[in-house]
Amino acid sequence: MSNNYTADNIDALEGMEAIRMRPGMYLGSTDTRGLHHCVWEILDNSVDEAKAGHCTEINTILHKDGKVTISDNGRGIPIDEHKKYPGKSALEVVLTVPHAGGKFNGNSYKTSGGLHGVGSTVVNATSTYLHAEVIRDKKLHSLTFVNGGEVTGPLEVSNYKGPKKSGTSITWMSDQNIVTGKQIGRAHV
């Protein structure tokens, strides 16, 4: 260790890199409690839709392989291009840019839970896999991420003929090298 302490010694982490380097800061813990916190962050988004009167159904699936899926019949995360991030859908921005969300100005939600624009990004940053599906305007919009938020391709759009008019589904697998909790307790969800 050197006595020479200069600007060269100061790191400035940004975006998802900071989350992956210090996940406990965002999850409170990296053990089973952190794993549960990831579930609550995604679940809070669906609950916010319900509290705002836009959602009547929320489903949580704990898969045997450790993945988690939370889906709702809310409005669906916006999928149009974000004005501040040309070429990126609002869905990609919400899942990859800390402090991006619809809960800051009070126009979309009167009350909300979670980390207010950080939660979905934190879940993605601490996952080996995350797949998002949004149903809007009779279209299914899909986006997949790997290795802590690397998008695997462009937003995929296909016709949707299912029963839902709109909604969001998020499926992810937490990175066991970051969030070391082994099993999600059903009682905690």
Show where each model-derived region lies.
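GHKL-type ATPase core
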Residues: 1-8, 66-90, 101-186
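Bergerat-fold GHKL ATPase/HATPase_c domain
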Residues: 1-43, 92-95
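Conserved helix-loop functional segments at active or binding sites
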Residues: 18-21, 25, 48, 52, ...
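Short, surface-exposed helix-loop/turn micro-motifs enriched in polar/charged residues
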Residues: 27, 31-35, 50, 107-110, ...
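Conserved ATP-binding N-box helix of the HATPase_c
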Residues: 33-57, 119-126
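Sterically constrained small-residue positions within well-ordered secondary structures
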Residues: 51, 61, 161-163
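Short beta-strand/loop element within the Bergerat-fold HATPase_c
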Residues: 57-64
